[in-house]
């Protein structure tokens, strides 16, 4: 198996955020270093919904770690769907980003988002323009809309 997952919770405004880290085969978090991509799913989906697992596996094969997560009120994350907004999804993604910045084995951070996750990735990247660890790259897969 070329990838492994480690589950844990990051906390956002709406509660616990269910996450999974996918690492390249044989990767040692104590001694190895690599970039990490934050994978963001679309509306009404979750971290197990296509294309997120496919992307995580492909990145791991290429020697790149990834972290996928369920936005609030999706999958195994806390929160009520009626309370989910673009603003608190951006907050969820930022909480994951802040967590990734603390991982000593991560050299660079990238974003990849599908559908509404693409919108969130783009909007968060704009907010992080002055952050020294801002995303080194970003891929938007069928972003849902343009929001101002």
Q: Can you annotate each of these PLM segments?
A:
Residues 44-56:
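The serine-hydrolase catalytic nucleophile loop
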Residues 48, 74-106:
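Catalytic nucleophile-loop/oxyanion-hole region of alpha/beta-hydrolase
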Residues 44, 71-75, 145:
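Alpha/beta-hydrolase active-site loop signature
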Residues 56-78:
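Conserved alpha/beta-hydrolase
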Residues 96-148:
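Primarily recognizes the serine-hydrolase "nucleophile elbow" in alpha/beta-hydrolase
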Residues 1-31:
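N-terminal cap/lid segment of alpha/beta-hydrolase-fold proteins
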Residues 32-42:
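Short beta-strand element of the alpha/beta-hydrolase
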């Amino acid at each position: 198996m070329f990838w492994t997952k480690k589950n844990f919770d990051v906390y956002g405004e709406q509660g616990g955020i269910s996450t999974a880290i996918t690492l390249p085969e044989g990767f040692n978090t104590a001694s190895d270093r690599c970039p990490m991509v934050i994978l963001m799913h679309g509306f009404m989906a979750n971290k197990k919904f296509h294309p997120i697992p496919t992307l995580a596996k492909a990145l791991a094969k290429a020697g790149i770690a990834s972290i996928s997560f369920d936005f609030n009120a999706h999958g195994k994350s806390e929160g009520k769907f009626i309370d989910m907004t673009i603003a608190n999804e951006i907050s969820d993604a930022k909480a994951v980003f802040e967590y990734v910045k603390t991982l000593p084995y991560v050299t660079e951070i990238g974003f990849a988002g599908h559908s509404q996750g693409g919108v969130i990735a783009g909007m968060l990247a704009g907010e992080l323009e002055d952050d020294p660890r801002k995303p080194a790259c970003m891929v938007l897969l069928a972003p849902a809309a343009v929001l101002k």
